[in-house]
Curated annotation (Swiss-Prot):
<feature type="topological domain" description="Cytoplasmic">
    <location>
        <begin position="1"/>
        <end position="3"/>
    </location>
</feature>
<keyword id="KW-1133">Transmembrane helix</keyword>
<keyword id="KW-0472">Membrane</keyword>
<feature type="topological domain" description="Periplasmic">
    <location>
        <begin position="22"/>
        <end position="111"/>
    </location>
</feature>
<dbReference type="GO" id="GO:0005886">
    <property type="term" value="C:plasma membrane"/>
</dbReference>
<feature type="transmembrane region" description="Helical">
    <location>
        <begin position="4"/>
        <end position="21"/>
    </location>
</feature>
<dbReference type="InterPro" id="IPR023081">
    <property type="entry name" value="Cell_div_FtsB"/>
</dbReference>
<dbReference type="InterPro" id="IPR007060">
    <property type="entry name" value="FtsL/DivIC"/>
</dbReference>
<keyword id="KW-1003">Cell membrane</keyword>
<dbReference type="GO" id="GO:0032153">
    <property type="term" value="C:cell division site"/>
</dbReference>
<dbReference type="GO" id="GO:0030428">
    <property type="term" value="C:cell septum"/>
</dbReference>
<keyword id="KW-0812">Transmembrane</keyword>
<dbReference type="Pfam" id="PF04977">
    <property type="entry name" value="DivIC"/>
</dbReference>
<keyword id="KW-0131">Cell cycle</keyword>
<keyword id="KW-0175">Coiled coil</keyword>
<feature type="region of interest" description="Disordered">
    <location>
        <begin position="90"/>
        <end position="111"/>
    </location>
</feature>
<keyword id="KW-0997">Cell inner membrane</keyword>
Amino acid sequence: MRLITLFLLLLLLAIQYPLWLGKGGWLRVWDMQKQVASQNQRNAELKQRNLKLEGEVKDLKEGTGAIEERARYELGMVKDDEGFVQFVAPAPKTSETPLPPPAALQPNHRH
């Protein structure tokens, strides 16, 4: 009886091996599901990027407004009747009095 139980246990393990570790096993299916979810997320991101690029291409093909806007911001274009004005942040104020030398450079006065 003990031999039959051992044989059935080994047979059960032999049947379970492909289910868990085989080509179509649960572990492989679980890994594939993670890969599919990751790829679906990447596809959604790329779809949004493509829609944005498609809109830019459409604007560039149909009108000069997009081209003019791009030239103004990226190349600094101005029209003939316009003037170019650039705002610059003010420089930080420096103190008028010179800074004293560091303590290591000051002479030691001993009395």
